[in-house]
Amino acid sequence: MGIDLVKAGRVKKPGRKALVSKNPYLRLLVKLYKFLSRRTDHSFNKVVLKRLLMPRRFKAPLSLSKLSKHMEKRPDNTAVVVGTVTNDERMDVVPKLSVCALRVTETARKRILASGGEVLTFDQLVARSPTGSRCTLLRGATKAREAVKHFRNEVKGNPKPYVRSKGRKFEKARGRRHSRAFKV
């Protein structure tokens, strides 16, 4: 008795097993974290590996303001972001932070270092805490991209239309306002 492959007999697990990017530094990090996730029985390394293998759209940026807000209650921990840490001009004072990220923008790096904090790379983090102790994993909002606004669910929200122009006549009348016949 075999399995019916047409009726989803053998469903493969989703998620990437190998890195698609050609970036040599990222490839070395994946190799390092594959080793660590195999040799240590801590889930931190497995999660970091999973996030390193993700496509770029899931490595969403995280601003300094969100980062400092999350790290308020954990001043002795290192914030680990598998993505980019960006600057936020709305913040007047940046607290002392210990940050590990794939990339930190130039202005964000200057502000973190000026406040007495430190910016680490992932290999420096492994040397410091290979099991992920005293580390807090953070991530940016993946649904905040401009492209995501165009394919929202019909039930939850109105999807943003792809319009050729933003004038009065272009997709702003019938079906968009109650004053113009009806609103969906």
From Swiss-Prot:
GO terms for biological process: translation. The keyword Ribosomal protein applies. Keywords: Cytoplasm, Ribonucleoprotein, Ribosomal protein. It comes from the Eukaryota. One of its GO terms (cellular component) is cytosolic large ribosomal subunit. GO terms for molecular function: RNA binding; structural constituent of ribosome. It is found in: Cytoplasm. Gene3D superfamilies: 3.100.10.10. Disulfide bonds: none annotated. InterPro entries: Ribosomal_eL18, Ribosomal_uL15/eL18, Ribosomal_uL15/eL18_sf. Its main location: cytoplasm. Belongs to the eukaryotic ribosomal protein eL18 family. This is Large ribosomal subunit protein eL18. It comes from Theileria parva (East coast fever infection agent).
